[in-house]
Design a protein with these regions (language model features):
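Extended intrinsically disordered, low-complexity coil regions enriched in Ser, Thr, Gly, Ala
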Residues: 55, 234-236
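Detector for small/aliphatic-rich hydrophobic stretches
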Residues: 1-126, 363
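Short loop/turn microsegments at loop-to-beta-strand junctions
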Residues: 35, 212, 344-346
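C-terminal soluble interaction/assembly domains
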Residues: 306, 312-366
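Non-catalytic, conformational "gating/processing" segments within enzyme and secreted inhibitor domains
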Residues: 32, 76-231, 251-332
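Short amphipathic beta-strand starts and helix->beta connectors
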Residues: 25-33, 209-210, 239-245, 331-332
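Short Gly/aromatic-enriched secondary-structure transition segments
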Residues: 61-65, 175-184, 236-247
Length: 366
């Protein structure tokens, strides 16, 4: 990871800071032990939505995303495979597409922007179940089958904007499976024995006020980040601060004796609009999308789903974000290794080579 955050990374971090605490808290209040979401995927969709918005909606999205246009980069989060990368199994993609109703009247400027940025636009009868299946199949294809949500567009839908993100990468130095053993994880509701991966690594480490954070490099020079609080409670704000500092290249290199549990997180957020409204996009449930669909206000639903898993080999993660607009509706004489065992609830993030927050999550029960 080069430690230089490009514009897309900066905008994704703005979205991460605005929404992570609310999204993960809502997911956990819904009974999910582990939760994850993709700030980069959401930022990508909102950047396209901004181009199709006007009035108050445009101002609110400008305030959330900040200045600049992440859409000018063909690979804004720098995840597309490079020939020099050594892991043959590496796969990643970031894509956005739009389905517009035959009744929508998008502006030439919006269609031209989509064409310039590689956002494929289809015009169809969105009420036809075939289109819903097509959208679901597109998400499944872009996430390599990891996510296949059931989509149901109504006959009054004027637009369906979809963003997808996928990453499959190996650790730069994979864990040896024979070192994995079962040990106690101190969950909030009591201890449980889970599989821990073990090794000694030289990691970048930052000590926060009440947390310790470290990074684990991936084969592509992306990185998976971990933050382990020293006490219970909500530490999302400090975790994000430490993740962002690590993504910018901060941290002292230390020899660390690691203990990391294998885990999987999956989260579906059927109404991201509430979190967007709380973050200042007050029109999230009824956006002004005149440049996209030709009418306003437009009842709007935003849906987000994400999945993340790690094992001895590496990480696999995927996400999608859907916006439906309706008519009316990770020395020579070495010191003793520092020991970090993630044996209690902790935070995770995956950042791209440019430091963009691809995924952010919390693990309370591996």
């Amino acid at each position: 990871m080069d430690g230089v955050a490009n514009l897309a990374s900066q905008q994704a971090w703005r979205v991460a800071r605005a929404l992570s605490g609310r999204i993960l808290a809502q997911s956990e209040s819904g009974g999910n032990a582990n939760s994850v979401w993709s700030p980069a995927c959401v930022a990508n969709l909102l950047a396209v939505a901004r181009e199709g918005s006007a009035g108050a909606t445009r101002w609110e999205l400008d305030a959330l995303l900040g200045d600049g246009d992440l859409l000018v980069e063909p690979d804004p989060f720098d995840v597309e495979r490079k020939p020099a990368w050594g892991y043959d199994g590496y796969e990643a993609s970031s894509a956005t597409a739009a389905w517009l109703s035959k009744l929508a009247t998008p502006s030439d400027a919006f269609l031209r922007k989509c064409d310039e940025c590689g956002v494929h636009v289809s015009v169809d009868d969105l009420g036809d179940p075939r289109v819903s299946r097509e959208v679901s199949a597109w998400i499944s294809e872009k996430t390599r089958g990891l996510l296949s949500p059931a989509i149901s567009l109504s006959s009054v839908a004027l637009a369906c904007l979809v963003s997808a993100l996928y990453l499959k990468d190996a650790w730069a130095d994979p864990f040896e499976e024979y070192l994995t053993n079962r040990a106690l994880f101190h969950a909030e509701d009591g201890g449980v024995r889970v599989a821990f991966m073990h090794d000694e690594r030289c990691c970048r480490v930052i000590d926060g006020d009440d947390c310790v954070a470290f990074g684990m490099p991936l084969s592509s020079d992306a990185e998976m980040l971990f933050t382990l609080p020293n006490s219970g409670g909500d530490h999302m704000g400090e975790a994000l601060e430490l993740f962002e500092r690590l993504s910018c290249g901060e941290g002292e290199r230390e020899l660390v004796e690691l203990g990391i549990p294998r885990f999987e997180c999956e989260t579906t957020i059927p109404d991201l609009g509430m979190q967007l409204e709380a973050a200042g996009v007050y029109s999230a449930s009824a956006m002004n999308l005149v440049p996209m669909v030709g009418v306003e206000p437009t009842p709007t639903q935003v849906i987000h789903g994400a999945k993340l898993s790690i094992d001895e080999k590496g990480v696999e993660a995927g996400a999608y974000t859907i916006m439906i607009a309706c008519a009316g509706c990770p020395p020579e004489n070495p010191p003793e290794p520092r020991k970090i065992t993630l044996n209690r609830p902790f935070y995770v993030a995956v950042v791209s080579r440019t430091g963009a927050p691809l995924f952010v999550g919390r693990v309370t029960l591996p």
